[in-house]
Amino acid sequence: MRRGEGSDIASSRPYEPGDHVHAIDWKASARLSAAHGNDEFIVRERHAEEMSRVVLVIDRRPSMALYPDELPWLNKPRAVEFVTDLLVASALNQRGLVGYLDLGSHANGHEAGTPFWQRPRSQLSTWQGDLRERVLDYLSGGFDAPDDGLERALAYLSTAARGSLPLGTFVFIVSDFTAPLSPGSWARALEQRWDLVPIVVQDPIWEQSFPSIQGVLTPLADPGRSTRRLVRFDAKQVEERRRANQARLDGLLTDFAGLGLDAVLIGSSNPNDVHAALLSWAEHRAEQRGRRI
């Protein structure tokens, strides 16, 4: 939590679901309600109560639906669920505000390709439900975001949602990053002086590398399609795929480091492995900050 001096009022705004009832300015709300002839509420935001903000940007492209439960590889939806739950729990433990953004389809007619944006908010009251459960429910949407969904998401945060995200906001971008973002997208996001954290979710066998399946007739599924096709790779093709995948990951992590971003690599959907990866990132971050002091 970032605290200002004293408890001076920093600003006021209309009430939104999720705001604490204690933050309502009842006198100002009464005046506004009387003037407009209906119930309207004003919320006070104080310097001393300015909480840290965490935003989760979740990639919902078809490749993020891999791999099915019956296969012995990384189940990305489950890994993303564990990542999301740990980040939300950590933010709430620090009394932070949590926001969410993706470009997939959702219930109630929300179409793929349009921002599904939930501004940062605190833990909901008991009768409104648990914020952790609500965020996890967002992950039940479709895996049908466009290929440039992450670029659109970062552009949305830098424009339409910018007013909700002060300097120092943590923005966790969760994706397999197999569809690269343009340097300009990262540059515009970095200009906002947010704390950007890429979380790379890739299967260690099929995406970080490639298995030795030369000569074996192998069924492969195309992301976003229910059908599978049978393919057979020779030794040269296997080696080319392996080198290409390894180079892609190495290049991705190198690019992130060049931008000053500490990426997290997730290659397992086991809760303990996910927790260990995030804990290692947090410890490394604390160590790096200690060196700068």
Across the structure, where does each feature detected by a protein language model lie?
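Short domain-edge segments at the starts or junctions of modular domains/repeats
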Residues: 10-11
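Exposed, interaction-prone extracellular/peripheral surfaces
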Residues: 1-4, 14-22, 28-35, 43-47, ...
